[in-house]
């Protein structure tokens, strides 16, 4: 698709930054894109770790085919960026025989590490 020379207006845009490191922003464009995010500053749990941001947000837009897309996400030091959306592919179900085998294996005691 060729780039458009059409200027898309910003309908609304807000941003708040707080002294404690937390923030909130959102915007909406003339072509229906919306986005928002909130974040807080979290102290590292170890003395050698710095502070980091924990964020939650969402964005939505309409694709070229007219389909509405919405994504919610979180981001932190433990899980990284974790998006969720109804349009994301999902894995196929695990066949029952394989699931039974996995369940059985989970009940077994740990085995010693293999030695070279």
UniProtKB/Swiss-Prot annotation:
Glycans are attached at residues 90, 107, 111. InterPro entries: CHIT_BIND_RR_consensus, Cuticle_Struct_Prot, Insect_cuticle. 3 variants exists that arise from a sequential glycosylation with N-acetylgalactosamine at three (ABD-4A), two (ABD-4B) or one (ABD-4C) threonine residues. The keyword Glycoprotein applies. It holds the Pfam family Chitin_bind_4. The modification Proline amide is found at residue 116. PROSITE patterns: CHIT_BIND_RR_1 (PS00233), CHIT_BIND_RR_2 (PS51155). Residues 78-97 are annotated as: Disordered. The keyword Glycoprotein applies. One of its GO terms (cellular component) is chitin-based extracellular matrix. It comes from the Eukaryota. Component of the soft endocuticle of migratory locust. This is Endocuticle structural glycoprotein ABD-4. The lineage of its organism: Eukaryota, Metazoa, Ecdysozoa, Arthropoda, Hexapoda.
């Amino acid at each position: 698709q060729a780039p458009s020379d059409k200027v898309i207006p910003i309908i609304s845009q807000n941003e708040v930054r707080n002294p404690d490191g937390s923030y909130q922003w959102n915007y909406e464009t003339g072509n229906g894109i919306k986005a928002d995010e909130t974040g807080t500053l979290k102290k590292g749990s170890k003395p050698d770790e710095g502070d980091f941001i924990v964020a939650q947000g969402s964005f939505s837009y309409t694709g070229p085919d007219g389909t509405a897309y919405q994504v919610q996400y979180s981001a932190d030091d433990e899980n990284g960026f974790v998006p969720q959306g109804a349009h994301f592919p999902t894995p196929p179900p695990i066949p029952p025989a394989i699931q039974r085998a996995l369940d059985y294996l989970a009940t077994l005691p740990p085995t010693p590490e293999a030695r070279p």
